[in-house]
Amino acid sequence: MHDPTARASASRESWELWRELPDPLPAEAIIAANQPREDVGTHRSYTYRDWEFTVPPGVFSPGLTSELVFDRLLDGTIVLAGRSYAVMGCGLGVEAVIAASRGARDIYALDVHPESTRTTADNFTRLAGAASRTTLAPITSDLFAAFPQAARADVITFNPPAVKEAVSHHPDIVRNTCVGGDVVTRFLDQVAERDLLTPGGEVYVVLSNTAELHRITGHAIESGYSVEIAHSQGWPGSDVRTFLFRLRRP
């Protein structure tokens, strides 16, 4: 987006979207909507479509918000074929396996939790590796701190632990649920400052009204991103509204 007029138009449209976003839910509603599971310290399994993933202790098992991202990867809303893909917070590796099935050229699977990057690598090898031409680089990293200096991505996804209220003090639950909005603004700053997107590249971030939507998206717009909604979803019996944001750089 090198045309100044196009950039100005994208900024106006982004701010118009920003004004329409909902305020955060009350604290008690946020806490009620994010009650932690009690099994994070156990060996588990997780099934998505026809893939069954192993989930060791400490690795988070995906919920409905994660599956919203998985579905958009699988249905082509997020285009991966022939592209370089970075998944921030790779967990047990579902995004990586889907990306291989959708023809991604290479995948950077990042997570701050070492057992999660190991689990992603193991599940990827077992479920996708033998028949896939996609290369996987599992990286244990605080955001992009350990991301290769010369690497760039066409697509980056992040389902951040941006819930604004503390729903637990268990470190594994906090890490996966309620770090807060700062982790997203740091993520966006690093993408911009290190120029991590290829020309025409896209960032997809999942946020709901259990997070500080206005602060996070406002920071993105002020930092030069255009912001669109690629998908939005409500949940039966809940006031939670979840958004998959598509962000682009000039």
Which role does the model predict for each range below?
Residues 1-44, 48:
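N-terminal auxiliary segments of SAM/dcSAM-dependent transferases
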Residues 28-100, 237-248:
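SAM-dependent Rossmann-like transferase core, predominantly class I methyltransferases
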Residues 54, 137-140, 228-230:
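General small-molecule cofactor/ligand-binding pocket signal
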Residues 71-151, 155-158, 164-165, 169:
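Conserved SAM/SAH cofactor-binding pocket of Class I
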Residues 124-128, 191, 220:
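Conserved hydrophobic residues forming the short capping helix/wall of the S-adenosyl-L-methionine
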Residues 171-197:
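Glycine-rich S-adenosyl-L-methionine
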Residues 200-206:
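Conserved beta-strand signature within the Rossmann-like core of class I S-adenosyl-L-methionine
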Residues 207-250:
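Class I S-adenosyl-L-methionine
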